[in-house]
Structures are given as structure tokens and as C-alpha cells.
Amino acid sequence: MGSPRTCPSCTPSSVGADRLIRASTELRGETQDLIRGLKYRNQRNVVADLADRLVSSILADPHAPTFELVTWAPTSMVRQRQRGYDQSELLAKAVAGRLGLRCRRLLYRDRSAPQTGRNRQERLNGPVFRARPMRRPYRVLVIDDVVTTGSTLRAAAHALDLAGAKEVCLLAVAATPRDRSTNSRVA
């Protein structure tokens, strides 16, 4: 088995650059309102709309690989207890259902503080994830709600690489505007 790879649509254009994170749109307007509703006002009914946006961005990409599993970048336990759910898990399950794929929890987050409210430098030192070793190498799609610096999704990808993933693609519903983000691309 060779070294872990990113999918063609997630491969950075410059050699040695960090893994590219795709987002279906920028965090503005209606999308921002929907995500805030999901995260802070228990509006789980918006999951279907947000999942449709993610699936549309996948299907519009002619280079998207054939994924075998969908997972999510888990939110902190503090936030999950406050909300009663993990919004990224809900999104991942909805995306998997629309794509006819299995959704499994592959990642476990350390007990780090939530990213919300942290400044850019603090976010760059994002959470640490662990993943159980895979029985066989899978092509994994990792879903998250918002990408700001990319540290959360890159940490998730690193854990999956170490667990034996064949390919890891990273997709968020929305990215903060480029001037506040790092190495993310709106699909």
C-alpha cells in the first residue's frame, strides 16, 4: 500500500502545499443564517437544504472520486452536550443517504475547547482527532459545517491517514471569506 492520497479534486495545485479543503459556498447571507440556525437555534430542519448543497457540489465535480464511506469532523463534547446533537454528524448522515453510502463515526475528538470564539492563531492550533485503524483502506469523505482556518479538517484527515484511509476528501458547507481563511476553495 502506498502513502495516503487526497482525491483529485482535493489535491493542492502546488507541490508541498497543505491538503485543500472544499466548501460548497462562502459563509454569507442565507447560508450563514441556515448554519447559525442549525448550530444555535436547534433548527435541525435546515439539514436537508445544507446536505443538498453539499451533494450538488460533489456531483458538479467531474474529478470527484467514488467515495466508500462518509464521516464527519466531530464537534467538541461541550458543544454536543449543549445542543443535544452534533450538527456535522447530522449533515454527514444526510449526505451519505443522498449518495447511497454508509456513514460511520470514524473520528474521535480530544477534550479540547470549542473552536467558536477563538482567534485565528488559537484556531490554527485546532483540535486533535484519533481514528481506529481501518480493516481495509477506504475512500473517505469528511463533512463539516464551516471551515475557517482549515485546522479542524486537516487534523481529521491526518488521523484518517494514520488509520489507513486510501483517500480522504474534505468538504464543508461553507468557508469564511478567503481573507479570514486558509487554503480553502469554494466549489
What are these regions (language model features)?
Residues 1-187:
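Glycine-rich phosphate/pyrophosphate-handling loop used in enzymes and phosphotransfer proteins
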